[in-house]
Amino acid sequence: MLDQNVVKQHCRIDTDFTGDDALLTLYTGAAAHYVQTWTRRTLYEKEDSPGYVDDPAPILLNDDVKAAMLLLIGHWYANRESVVVGQTVAEVPFAVEALLQPYRIYGV
């Protein structure tokens, strides 16, 4: 969904290094799932993606969504455990939610 080289650049990984490609692919899929779960909408790469036309509330992979996904991926890549010792605490999901807020569908 996101270009692997863009993900690597965001994570400050040399684009020629392939040792973490599977991990980055996993994080990219998890970030896309996070977007869909948080917004309660199906994420589509482009308008001609299968299902987009028939979806009553689709969300496109626009710059806001890409930035949110990159923030999540970068956070997960840098912090691979649930607790980080010796670091200042910063809530990355808040920045992600700020980017995704305009696209969220609130329940009935």
What is each of the regions a protein language model found here?
Residues 1-108:
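Divalent metal-cofactor coordination and adjacent catalytic microenvironments
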